[in-house]
Curated annotation (Swiss-Prot):
This is 3-hydroxyanthranilate 3,4-dioxygenase. Fe cation 1 binds at H50, E56, H96. The gene is nbaC. GO terms for biological process: anthranilate metabolic process; L-tryptophan catabolic process; NAD biosynthetic process; quinolinate biosynthetic process. Homodimer. O2 binds at R46. Signal peptide: none annotated. Pathway: Cofactor biosynthesis; NAD(+) biosynthesis; quinolinate from L-kynurenine: step 3/3. GO terms for molecular function: 3-hydroxyanthranilate 3,4-dioxygenase activity; ferrous iron binding. CDD domains: cupin_HAO. Keywords: Dioxygenase, Iron, Metal-binding, Oxidoreductase, Pyridine nucleotide biosynthesis. Pfam families: 3-HAO. Substrate binds at E56, R100, E111.
Amino acid sequence: MTKLSAFNFQKWIDEHKHLLKPPVGNQLVFKDADLMVTVVGGPNKRTDYHDDPVEEFFYQLKGDMLLKLHDTSTGEFYDVPIREGDIFLLPAHIRHSPQRPQEGSIGLVIEPARPEGVLDAVEWYCFECSGLVHRAEVDLESIVDDLPPLYAAFYNDEKLRTCPHCNTVHPGKNPPEGWVAL
């Protein structure tokens, strides 16, 4: 067994800061662990909602973020600001869209590995009628590798972006002006 040791987390963040900006935006701290410990940097813009089959722990280290939530049992969309120094535990299967509009913001997200055969999903909702436009599921092993192809497929296909309820075409990557307000 390899000898275990601690490391300075702030130094790790400083050494990986160049990866905490678009287009990558996040980095796994531990590659071979049962916990996915991810550092996420801002700014980011996203229009999808993640349906995560496990809990997610958020700790906002620097700057503020906004967690957009969708309660599928009531249809309600609402925002939870997570300020610098705040923590938040998101239950499994709560649709959420993490927004980090501030340049240089940094958050820590911790979640358990998925049980075998359990899928993650990303969903896009219509900005006009709030109906579900598209859902894509994935057997998630790597946030960095497995999610980008789902986004690319949606963004590059107008048919996938067309709302089946009102025929409005979803804007893809770019949310409407004012969608994120801290």
